Structure formats: C-alpha cells, structure tokens
Amino acid sequence: MAIWAKAEAWLAGPWLALNRARTLGTRAVLAPKGVLPFEAIPQFPGKKWMRVLQLWREQGFENNHLEMHQTFQELGPIFRFDVGGRNMVLVMLPEDVERCQKVEGLHPQRDVPGPWLAYRHLRGHKCGVFLLNGPTWRLDRLQLNPGVLSLQAMQKFTPLVDGVARDFSQALRARVMQNARGSLTLDIKPSIFRYTIEASNLVLFGERLGLLAHQPNPESLDFIHALEVMFKSTVQLMFMPRSLSRWTSTGTWKEHFEAWDCIFQYANKAIQRLYQELTLGHPWHYSGVVAELLTHANMTVDAIKANSIDLTAGSVDTTAYPLLMTLFELARNPEVQQALRQESLAAAARISENPQKAITELPLLRAALKETLRLYPVGIFLDRCVTSDLVLQNYHIPAGTLVKVLLYSLGRNPAVFARPERYHPQRWLDNQGSGTRFPHLAFGFGMRQCLGRRLAQVEMLLLLHHVLKNFLVETLVQEDIKMIYRFIMTPSTLPLLTFRAIS
C-alpha cells in the first residue's frame, strides 16, 4: 500500500498544474565561458521507475506533450529525460534543430518505435525506410524520392487528388441540399477519414474505392479502427522494456499485433491487385506511385511492398487530423475563413484548368495549413540519434545521444511566434525571407523529412480549396479543444460543424 500511496502522490503532481500551464516564454540560455558537461543538463524530475509505473497504470502518456511543455517552462529550453531505461535530451528552439542538422552525415539516424520493429521481425516482414537506419535506409530512400517526394511526382498525382477532392465537395453538397435550410450540422470526422483513404489509395495504387458515394465497406472501417488501435498501443508499449511489458501488457501486445495484421492485409490486397494488372499489361498512363516504383525503381518487390505499407498506414490519420483542426479553426475564425475563400474563388478558374496551380495560387491557404500544424503538430517529436559530438545550449552532447525536438512547445513559444495562441496564417507570409525556415518543422527536416509530405500537402490543400469555395463552415464552440498524445497528437473530441451551401 505504501508504494501505491507514493506513486499516486507523484503521479498527481504534474497533472494538477497542466491545465494551468502558462504561455511558454523560453529563450536560449546565455552561455558561460566554458561548455558544460552532459551531466549538468537539467534533469526531468521524478524517478525512472515511477514513470514506468505511470505508463503501465494509465495505459499511455495522453498528456505527454503538456507535461514536457511545462517542464520546459520550469527547467529552460533543454533537459534530460529517462523512461524505461531510455535516455534522451529534449530541446524546443529552432537554433538547436539547425545545429542537429549541421552534424548529420550521409545516414541521419532516428529512433524507431520498438513495437513496430517487433511486429515485423516476428512476422518476418521487411522494414520500410521509416524503420531503417544506415546505408540500407539511404539506398531505399534515394530510390523512393523520385516517385513519391519529387516535384515531378507531385505534378503527376495532383490531378488524381483533385478529382477525389471535387467528389468529396459534391457528395457533401448533395447531403446539404437535402435539407430545406441548405445547411447540414454533423460530425465531419468519418467523412474526412474516408476522403484521406480514398485519395491516398488512388495516388498509391491507382484505384478508387468508392468511399465517398456510399457507406464505406467493412474492410475500410476495420482499417481505420486498426490504425487507431495501432497508434494507441504503440505508446503503451514503446517506453516500457519488452522484458517487462511481455508480462504486464500481454493484452496490449495482442491488440498491437492484430492491428498491424489488419493493416498489412489491407495494403497487401491492393498491392496484389496492382501487381497482377501490371504483369498482364503495362499501363500507358500514370497509374499511381506504387506502379511507378514497380516499373522504374531499382528495388526488390519486397522493399516496394514494405514501403507501400508504411505509406498506406501513414497517409490517413496524419492527414485527416490536420484537416479536421483546420476546419475547426476556420469555423471559429470566420474572418480568416473569408480571406481564404476569396483567395480560392479568385484562383478557381486557373486551378480548375490545371490543378497543379493550387500549389502556387493559394499562398494564404498553404499558410493556414502551416498555422494548423504549428498549433497541432501530428507528430509532436522530431528526433535524431546524433552521430557526432555537438553543443546545444552550451551543453556537451556526446555522439550516440537521442535528441528529441518537441514541436508542440516550439510552435507555442512567444520568443519564436508572436501571440502564439492566436490562429494567424498571415504570419507565415509576413515573415517570408526574414528568418530561418526551421520554425516550420511539421514534416521534419533534412534527408529524413516525411516521405509523404507532398502527398499530404496536396490532399489537404485541394480538399480545403473545394470546401471553402462551396460552403461556409460554422461552429458554436469557441473553446480550445483538448489534445491527447497517442503516438500522434489527436483531439480528444471534436465539435459538430455546420456546412452552409454557398449559392
């Protein structure tokens, strides 16, 4: 009983103050004359075993971003953190990200989720670039970039995404016009998830699923549920030593493996259909990213399959939640919404003629997406296992140290962003060319930036463009939404949104 009493007292402490956290005002530490040793870096308070106990009892770290945010307020812009035997250094200033990139070599190393590796090793699956480090990562990444991340690839798949975004807008309009009021109030989350699956599946595999025209098929619903379970169980397992979690979290491991089985099965079926069609006759036209890789990339089929599964799993939630949060922010900031609508209407004819022009014709909408990801980064951490010694905030960081950048705190720091609590897309246009590019880090940096970055940007940009042309988006909710950490950051609940047709 004594141990539980101590544990509960420790666990209660951080959470009592989280909702009262002040606006972060952390600036760089003024450097003394000599570089300080690693051991002098401020240490995250509390005992290591208590954090493992907390993780086990609460089945995750849903308030992880808030606790880390508060720790920066108390300790400054750098501190050490240890949980489950994993030592790391956390930072939150753009200058420290720049220093980390400057010491990157040919093979930037990142931390990879242990549960994801465990699943692939035990099932005998090859790893994609998200889970690789070293020369193998570089070889595969260089083969993938032309077909996925290049401007040429984006120009090819943008018209495909535009077709899905138009269909989404038309389907929503049909539902709205069924009401005599010409408006519809609903939970838009299921529709947005169906859109991201439909668009991503078309871009990756060249195949429409028909999710926008009718109720989704059971396989798609199972896939969405599997993604939710996979992300949530990842956090429940990744910070605990496997030697411990195999005994204390057997049910969670079972859920995690079953979720990945569903994800792999879903992607494998799409890959098998595409592979058969390609072997029967090479298509003369562009038919998606995976077809391009199978016909042009110098990669094995297993490597293409592994990376296709990573792209499939990573292209749904990570696009859907920024879309949902953007719609919410525009609904409670009608003046911003109107400015974006005017931009979209002015560019509508040019984008209709050539959807690729959306990238250059909608600068304020692109800024709005940056602003959403500043406040609500899907991945709250960027990390590097530094391969050479460096100095951060005048502390020596030895080679091999895991350094994590907390994007949640970086985006809410008034030393970097004036009035950070305000949703103000114009700030990104006002600051063009006036400073570092590192404040916008939602998709990572350097060679290890998100492989699906351009696909995600196009999916979000075109959907919002077509929605804003056709609907006013409204809400009664003005309060901030509570965000929770489940490997990605998601809203705990979403308010109803009203879509009102524009004649």
UniProtKB/Swiss-Prot annotation:
Residues bound to heme: 450
The keyword Metal-binding is assigned to this record: yes
Needed co-factor(s): heme
Pathway annotation: Steroid biosynthesis; glucocorticoid biosynthesis; Steroid hormone biosynthesis
Principal location listed in the UniProt entry: mitochondrion
Organelle targeting sequence: 1-24
Compartments where found: Mitochondrion inner membrane
UniProt xrefs under InterPro entries: CYP11_CYP27_families (IPR050479), Cyt_P450 (IPR001128), Cyt_P450_CS (IPR017972), Cyt_P450_E_grp-I (IPR002401), Cyt_P450_sf (IPR036396)
Catalytic activity: a steroid + 2 reduced [adrenodoxin] + O2 + 2 H(+) = an 11beta-hydroxysteroid + 2 oxidized [adrenodoxin] + H2O; 11-deoxycortisol + 2 reduced [adrenodoxin] + O2 + 2 H(+) = cortisol + 2 oxidized [adrenodoxin] + H2O; 21-hydroxyprogesterone + 2 reduced [adrenodoxin] + O2 + 2 H(+) = corticosterone + 2 oxidized [adrenodoxin] + H2O; corticosterone + 2 reduced [adrenodoxin] + O2 + 2 H(+) = 18-hydroxycorticosterone + 2 oxidized [adrenodoxin] + H2O
Membrane topology designation: Peripheral membrane protein
GO BP of this protein: aldosterone biosynthetic process; cellular response to peptide hormone stimulus; cholesterol metabolic process; cortisol metabolic process; glucocorticoid biosynthetic process
GO cellular-component term (any): mitochondrial inner membrane
UniProtKB keywords: Heme, Iron, Membrane, Metal-binding, Mitochondrion, Mitochondrion inner membrane, Monooxygenase, Oxidoreductase, Steroidogenesis, Transit peptide
GO terms of molecular function: corticosterone 18-monooxygenase activity; heme binding; iron ion binding; steroid 11-beta-monooxygenase activity
EC number annotated for this UniProt entry: 1.14.15.4, 1.14.15.5
Pfam families: p450
Family per record: Belongs to the cytochrome P450 family.
Function per UniProt: A cytochrome P450 monooxygenase that catalyzes the biosynthesis of aldosterone and other adrenal corticoids. Differing from other species (such as human, rat and mice), it is able to catalyze three sequential oxidative reactions of 11-deoxycorticosterone (21-hydroxyprogesterone), namely 11-beta hydroxylation, followed by two successive oxidations at C18 yielding 18-hydroxy and then 18-oxo intermediates, and ending with the formation of aldosterone. Steroid 11beta, 18- and 19-hydroxylase.
Protein name per its UniProtKB record: Cytochrome P450 11B1, mitochondrial
Species annotation: Sus scrofa
Lineage: Eukaryota, Metazoa, Chordata, Craniata, Vertebrata
Gene (UniProt): CYP11B1
